[in-house]
UniProtKB/Swiss-Prot annotation:
GO molecular function: homoserine O-acetyltransferase activity
Protein species of origin: Mycobacterium marinum (strain ATCC BAA-535 / M)
Domain AB hydrolase-1: 52-356
Location of this chain's protein in the cell: Cytoplasm
Protein name: Homoserine O-acetyltransferase
Domain of life according to the entry: Bacteria
Length: 379
């Protein structure tokens, strides 16, 4: 599929979820997914010249609902409230913020729980996808709305990987970027923790090789364990110890078989994810993260990054143990459009990019100033 093959559709009303039909999508692997839909939301008005779009790219279990309360089509509040809106870092008086639910997801976009052409869930038939495939799907969704270039791409974690693929793969389509809490490729540590999460899901008897959607039984136990393990990598060690230490949960005594406070906290995180996420999507998206490598097929990471002309802000979190600062330092050193690594001092670990609003907001401001600086120049 090429961009010109996609018919033009209309932008949704502000905050409304719209399913954008992008037709068939040929993946990096050569496989084809038919009848692909991408869930999309926007905030702010599109300028007459269509040059003020800021793409906000979510992390692994996020969705298109960046800001606002829970409501029809989005059962949870916005995952980055305060970052988008009138007077916010992405000021909707100036910018049109657009967010998609990623290809392979489960919040409206085509993924393993979606119905295939035969009317049955894709399940195990859903092909392996890459971060590059996710970017191609996003670009096709934008093109269906008549948008072929964006002012900026902004994302952290998996969203940062998508933003990186945007600027390296399509530098002519974006004026600036913010890369938060991400690296140029998956590390052995990330792959190790993430394949272990996948193994927990697949060890659940209800997984049924991914074909569980019509059985009435989901691999809930496996998904909860995966989320508990993942959440430990998202938070800082000092933060967790200062909050929970080795305390029991409430009146429970661990010495007498009761739960620890940290144990209860992680169980709660697993329960919350069960209410809104599909295990098949968790596996597919985690596998895509494991294969993330911006240098693949581009003569390696050094060549891929050195050849990217897009002005970029790179940010990292001091206590991030999933994507440690050395990974962002590599990006900052090799991307010619980066003026230097921006360090966010936080004890909150990888999730600092979501919760350190003031510091991250300033990085967004810097990114959009770069977009403004290039607005009068040829693309």
């Amino acid at each position: 599929m090429t961009i010109s093959d996609v018919p033009t559709q209309t932008l949704p009303a502000e905050g409304e979820v719209r399913l954008v039909d992008i037709g068939s999508l040929r993946l990096e692997s050569g496989a084809v997914i038919d009848n692909v839909c991408i869930a999309l939301q926007r905030w702010g008005e599109l300028s007459p010249t269509r040059d003020n779009v800021v793409m906000v790219l979510h992390a692994l279990t996020g969705d298109s609902h960046v800001t606002g309360p829970a409501g029809p089509g989005h059962s949870t509040p916005g995952w980055w409230d305060g970052m988008v809106g009138p007077g916010a870092p992405i000021d909707t008086n100036r910018w049109c913020a657009v967010a998609t639910n990623v290809l392979g997801g489960c919040r409206g976009s085509t993924g393993p729980s979606s119905l295939a052409r035969d009317g049955k869930p894709w399940g195990s038939r859903f092909p392996l996808i890459s971060v590059r495939d996710q970017v191609e799907a996003d670009m096709a969704a934008l093109a269906a709305l008549g948008i072929t270039q964006v002012a900026a791409v902004v994302g952290g974690s998996m969203g940062g990987a998508r933003a990186l693929e945007w600027i390296v793969g399509h530098p002519d389509r974006v004026r600036s970027a913010l890369l938060l809490a991400v690296g140029a490729r998956a590390t052995a540590d990330q792959i190790g923790t993430q394949t272990t999460q996948i193994a927990a899901i697949k060890a659940d008897p209800n997984w049924r090789n991914g074909d569980y959607h019509e059985t009435g039984c989901k691999p809930e136990a496996g998904l909860k364990v995966a989320r508990r393990f993942a959440h430990l990598t998202y938070r800082g060690e000092i933060e967790l110890d200062s909050r929970f230490a080795n305390d029991g949960q409430g009146g429970e005594d661990p010495a007498d078989g009761g739960r620890y406070a940290i144990q209860s906290y992680l169980e709660h995180q697993g329960d919350k994810l069960l209410a809104r996420f599909d295990a098949g999507s968790y596996v597919i998206l985690t596998e895509a993260l494991n294969r993330h490598d911006v240098g693949r097929g581009r003569d390696g990471i050094h060549a891929a990054l050195r050849g990217c002309p897009v002005p970029v802000v790179v940010g990292g979190i001091t206590s991030d143990r999933l994507y440690p600062l050395r990974l962002q330092q590599e990006l900052a050193d090799l991307l010619p459009g980066c003026a230097g690594l921006e360090v966010v001092d936080s004890i909150r670990g990888h999730d600092g990019f979501l919760v350190e609003s003031e510091a991250v907001g300033e990085l967004i401001h810097k990114t959009l100033r770069l977009a403004e600086d290039r607005s009068s120049r040829p693309w």
